[in-house]
Amino acid sequence: MQFSSSIRQFLDKKRIVEFTKIQQAVFKLWPFQNIIGIAETGSGKTFAYLLPLLDKINTSLDQPQAVIFVPTKELQWQIINILTEIKKYFKTFTFATSFSSKAQLIVSLLNEKYLFTSKVRYVVFDEIDMFLEQSSIQQWLECVHLFQKAKPLFAFFSATLFNQQLQIIKKQVINTKVINLHPKQWIHPLVKHFVVHLNTENRFSGLLALLKHHQNQQIIVFCSNQKSLKQLTQLLSNNNISFGSIYGSLTYQERKNNFTKATNNKLKLLVVSDLFSRGIDLNYFSVVISWDLPKIDSFYIHRSGRVARLNSWGRSYLFWNDQNQSKLNKLIAKGIKFQNVSLTSNGDLKFLTENNQKTTKKPLSTLQIKKIKAIKAKYKKVKPNYKKYQKQQIQNLLINKKKPRSWKNF
């Protein structure tokens, strides 16, 4: 794709001489038709939709022509920072975060007030799967229907988009071309996954061991809810461990300050909620730790995707316990391979090789448990070799159990 001289100057300044696979694929179709782009985290999806969009904006027209909807403030700030850099190479390009502005490009959250304008020709939803969650899908539908009055071209992007979500989009926006460069959506080739096994329930001892092991690297710790986040930050404070944090209940300025520190390499340890797992580029961070597992399985992929961006390696750790065993097994069933890690008596990490890997039994379903109980109930009267027959029946039951449901990837 041939870009304008302004964009070419920006690319030259940033020494971008080669485009990623998702960018090359998107440039052929966008913004000439509706598209859905699916590619792994850190693959360059933002530039994939943003550069062609900027090429089509009429900078002599002082009104909104394109809208980018994002799910979090942090992703909004990141895109604004990128646009601030690009604007230096344009004479009259304007952008804003509010529809009250006459800016040519609006970067907005879905829950902010948005106004319909007939001049909007391009609408992008970044991290679209978050808009399709139960809490926000109705608002998303209303937004799409409103902007469809102007007959714009739509673009939807995410690293994880499954069949049911894909059908929702295609039902609302017809003639949509799917670009799927991430068929194995649960697997990132540059992320190594680890399970930390503890002899006690004290996860904090495991966290301290990880911080010690990666003391020369920058680390993100994810928490699935406000309660666990506050508990962890209190533990870190009590142990005089320096950290920054980003989560929903912080003030706007606190979130903005810590976000700026993290993106400018001013923080060694960052504790965040899952709000921070989407689309954020942190070039200096290489380790992700899940203090607990997210409620939605796919969020784990987005957590681990904060590292291993643009061809750099990353590590993702989680802690094993009885409570998250079933969630862990779901991730394993999706094809994610975990290396087991144990904690030595002196508080160091021991990475287990394939020969001495710990094994974790997959949990039985409620139906399987009922069937096993029924098998055992048959043998109330003791007969010769009854234990052998009983064991064989149970083994046959487990061998013939249904495979876990797999998502259809596109």
UniProtKB/Swiss-Prot annotation:
Report domain Helicase ATP-binding positions.
26-179
A GO CC term attached to the entry: cytosol
Domain of life assignment: Bacteria
Q: Does the keyword ATP-binding apply?
A: yes
**Annotated residues for binding of ATP:** 39-46
CDD domains per UniProt: SF2_C_DEAD
Q: Indicate the segments forming the Helicase C-terminal domain, all copies.
A: 190-357
Motif DEID box — list its residue ranges: 126-129
Under InterPro entries, the record lists:
DEAD/DEAH_box_helicase_dom (IPR011545), DEAD_box_RNA_helicase (IPR050079), Helicase_ATP-bd (IPR014001), Helicase_C-like (IPR001650), P-loop_NTPase (IPR027417)
What does the UniProt keyword field contain? ATP-binding, Helicase, Hydrolase, Nucleotide-binding, RNA-binding
Top enzyme category = hydrolase
- Give the reaction(s) catalysed: ATP + H2O = ADP + phosphate + H(+)
Q: What is its EC number?
A: 3.6.4.13
Q: Which GO terms describe its molecular function?
A: ATP binding; ATP hydrolysis activity; RNA binding; RNA helicase activity
Task: Please state which protein family the record places this protein in.
Answer: Belongs to the DEAD box helicase family.
PANTHER family the record matches? ATP-DEPENDENT RNA HELICASE RHLE, ATP-DEPENDENT RNA HELICASE RHLE-RELATED
Q: What is this protein called?
A: Probable ATP-dependent RNA helicase MG308
Q: What organism does this protein naturally occur in?
A: Mycoplasma genitalium (strain ATCC 33530 / DSM 19775 / NCTC 10195 / G37)
Its lineage opens with:
Bacteria, Bacillati, Mycoplasmatota, Mycoplasmoidales, Mycoplasmoidaceae
